[in-house]
Amino acid sequence: MNYPGTELELFAEATNWKRYFASKLRPFVRGRVLDVGCGMGVNANYLVGPTVSSYTFLEPDLQLLAHVPDHIDASLKKMSEMVHGTVDKLEGRQFDTILYVDVVEHIEQGPDELDRAYSLLAPGGHLLVLVPAYQFLYSKFDEEVGHVKRYNKEQMRSELPRWARPVSLYYLDSMGVLLSLANKFLLHQARPTRSQIRFWDRCMIPISRIMDKVL
């Protein structure tokens, strides 16, 4: 499987954004971690803390998986493994944390995927899902990078495994909504430029960190 577009390469430089969402997820990341659809592994360094004992990178695109060692710290390499495939390949194993960072929106049958992942979750474990918000923002960019849809809270809750008990469900990057609206109705770009990514990451994410607390 080959990943469409250059989304991963563009957003690899969005370090403020990665620090922001990682700060929300990291308190739940512990023990044996499975990173589903890890891409090039660029999120792992932001998510790993002292409570992580092992880290499994799972990616269906072999070319992307080959780049993982280039993007992770030496300490993480010592406790990590790379697996080419999908969650079906890990049947019978258990993990304390399962991550889906910008992955579920690419999958036609999201609920089935999360059900399979949940079967790999150890008792007391956490399933962490990050997806793009609001279907009304769906644009040429989403289509270009293979997004099936965007989510609101109710849709996300409905696709979680029926046995799961949601601990937290919220929106991030309120200022990003304005930029997405501008692209959808004015720019009509299939992908942002590097300078646009930098503007969003350096100028808008710090504002979102403040605004997200009050909205």
Segments and roles (model prediction):
Residues 8, 127-159:
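Short, glycine-/aromatic-enriched active-site segment of Class I SAM-dependent methyltransferases
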Residues 157-172:
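A SAM-dependent methyltransferase catalytic signature shared across enzymes that methylate proteins
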Residues 111-126:
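A short glycine-rich, Lys/Arg-flanked "PGG" loop and its adjoining helix->strand segment in the class I
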Residues 7, 42-43, 168-208:
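Conserved catalytic loop of SAM-dependent methyltransferase domains
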Residues 101-104, 130:
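Residues lining the SAM
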Residues 1-101, 111-114, 193-194, 198, ...:
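Conserved N-terminal segment of class I S-adenosyl-L-methionine
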